[in-house]
Amino acid sequence: MSNQLNTMDIKEILKFLPHRYPFLLIDRVLDFTPGETLHAIKNVTINEPFFQGHFPVQPVMPGVLILEAMAQATGLLAFKTMSEEPSNDALYYFAGIDKARFKRVVEPGDQLHFEVQMIKERRGIGVFTGVAKVDGEVVCSAEIMCARREISK
């Protein structure tokens, strides 16, 4: 059995996710096991555009963007699980969220770690659990659904 990690750098992430600045919220995948789990990171800096208005005196990353980053991690795991190469023909869309909970704020200088796990997949809809952590402390948890959809041209 190999201890080699499956990683993705930003160049590979850009091949799988359609998001671009300022909405690409995954910087690196540290490890993944198709059909099971994926561990990704987001380095949160003061240069993030959302900090200009949320909030100028006490910058806090919006919770919806933490959830969006978690959804992007599930999309990467879905692609890797289906052994699907990126193309312009299909995307995995954020389809739903349940049981979202926020435990603490995320501030400039934090490194968010996303741990997502595939629970089930049926007819192109995947159900995942996700946890976001900073320094090992849970920031946010949720159950996320994503759906594969053909792109109409």
Curated annotation (Swiss-Prot):
Q: Which EC number(s) does the record attach to this protein? A: 4.2.1.59
GO annotations under biological process? fatty acid biosynthetic process; lipid A biosynthetic process
Q: Which UniProt keywords apply?
A: Cytoplasm, Lipid A biosynthesis, Lipid biosynthesis, Lipid metabolism, Lyase
**Protein's cellular compartments:** Cytoplasm
InterPro entries from the entry?
FabA_FabZ (IPR013114), FabZ (IPR010084), HotDog_dom_sf (IPR029069)
Q: What reaction does this enzyme carry out catalytically?
A: a (3R)-hydroxyacyl-[ACP] = a (2E)-enoyl-[ACP] + H2O
Entry GO CC? cytoplasm; membrane
Recorded protein name is 3-hydroxyacyl-[acyl-carrier-protein] dehydratase FabZ
From what organism does this protein derive?
Shewanella pealeana (strain ATCC 700345 / ANG-SQ1)
